A protein has these predicted regions:
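Covalent nucleotidyltransferase
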Residues: 1-278
Length: 278
């Protein structure tokens, strides 16, 4: 089980322990900046996380299971109605954060009693907005829409299959206890690290790059997209319109490549790249 050791971080005042249940209780809103890749966890990574949490939950101990650090930075997020809210820009940890949201959605939709629905309906579940795809549908992702939706749909299917293969009621109850109920002694927690608010966008990108060295490499198209967007954000940090338009146009182009008729017409059957846009 890949449980992080919290003690190694206690000397740093920017680190703290934050239970997943606390993220739900306080209705956190997370923003995934456009220079990051989207959701890319495959089935094995989703299953590994489920198995780790299940192994911890079965022990029924008064203990905590620590996920890897969630690196965040306070920011403002503008809603569709124009109102601004306090949010957290995620610099590292978005894959686990998003996968946990999908697990919580499964529990909410399939395992909650009527009493639990009434208790948690007002503040279930923490929000995540991908700035390059603000309309991303977590409930019913269409794998044909874009690559993020494809991976979301794959992850949701893996979660359903995993719970179906288990003794569902018992396992679902154990998951709810360690993920949702803050009063329970066994809690799944993030190691929460806050980057100081005064850091500028260019420094956020530098932090992101340092954190992601050695991880799964980006595809060619993801690198090109990130360079374009970072260039727009750095040159015109106070005006995000141009960067947002570039992201929107890029997503339209990526979606067009998912059209099989169009793809086979232009590709001549060449499927040797990691993604079609490459």
């Amino acid at each position: 089980m890949n449980n992080m050791n919290y003690n190694q971080f206690t000397d740093n005042p920017n680190f703290c322990r934050k239970a997943v249940a606390e993220l739900i209780k306080t209705k956190h809103h997370f923003v995934i900046p456009s220079y990051q890749r989207g959701y890319r966890w495959e089935e094995k990574q989703v299953i590994d996380l489920l198995n780790d949490i299940n192994e911890f939950a079965k022990q029924n101990k008064e203990d905590s299971y620590y996920l890897q650090p969630l690196v965040v930075k306070p920011c403002k997020w503008t809603r569709r109605d124009g109102s601004q809210i306090d949010a957290w820009e995620v610099l590292d940890g978005q894959q686990r954060l998003t996968t946990l949201r999908l697990i919580l959605m499964y529990l909410f939709e399939n395992s909650f009693t009527r009493t639990e629905m009434n208790t948690f309906s007002d503040n279930m579940i923490y929000d995540i907005t991908y700035t390059n795809r603000p309309q991303l549908d977590f409930s019913e992702p269409n794998p044909q829409d874009n690559i993020d939706s494809y991976y979301l749909a794959t992850a949701k299917s893996a979660i359903v299959d995993w719970f179906t293969e288990k003794a569902q009621d018992e396992v679902e109850t154990a998951f709810k206890h360690c993920l949702i109920y803050p009063s329970k002694p066994a809690q799944v927690k993030f190691i929460w690290y806050v980057v100081p608010d005064e850091k500028q966008t260019i420094e956020s990108i530098q932090v992101f790059n340092r954190l992601n060295k050695g991880k799964i490499s980006l595809t060619s198209s993801e690198l090109i997209k990130a360079l374009f967007i970072m260039d727009r954000n750095i040159i015109s940090n106070n005006d995000r319109v141009e960067a947002d338009k570039l992201t929107f146009d890029w997503n339209l182009m990526e979606r067009q490549f998912q059209n099989d008729k169009f793809w086979y017409f232009i590709s001549n059957g060449n499927d040797n790249q990691q993604t079609r846009i490459d």
